[in-house]
Amino acid sequence: MKILKEEVLFNCSAKDLWTILSDVSRSDWVPSIESISLTGNLRSFEMDGIGSVTEEILLNDDQNMTLQYSAIKTPSKIDHHLATMRISSAGEGQATLIWTTEIDPEIFADGVHHGMLISIEGIKKVIES
């Protein structure tokens, strides 16, 4: 199993960043996803270059600004996927996102990491708009 981690400082309040990420039906910050459908705690979408993906939302905690989800259906056989996004205040008008993803088999780690990086850039674009 590989554990990926990104820690990023954003020029917005923690509350504003949480508003973007806690809306699990929102896809404007993920460049490879056009739309998301929700059924209970499951979100499904088509991801460019990947295909149909279904994720289970395990935790969407407003108080601790933590989102946790797991890919449970993907075109490729993934034995384990667990992503956690934690937001904290980093002072006046700034927020820190710590995003970790556990992935197994490790062969998928580079692709998952690339997806994290382009999504972080997507978040920055949403904040700036």
Question: What role is predicted for each listed range?
Answer:
Residues 25-76, 96:
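Glycine-rich portal/gate segments that line the openings of hydrophobic small-molecule binding cavities
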Residues 10-12, 47, 101-103:
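Short beta-strand-to-loop capping motifs
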Residues 1, 48, 62, 78-80, ...:
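Short coil/turn motifs at beta-sheet boundaries
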Residues 73-129:
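Beta-strand/loop substructures that line and gate deep hydrophobic ligand-binding cavities in soluble
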Residues 8, 53-59, 71, 82-89:
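Hydrophobic/aromatic beta-strand elements that line small-molecule binding cavities or substrate pockets
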Residues 1-37:
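Hydrophobic ligand-binding cavity/cleft-lining segments
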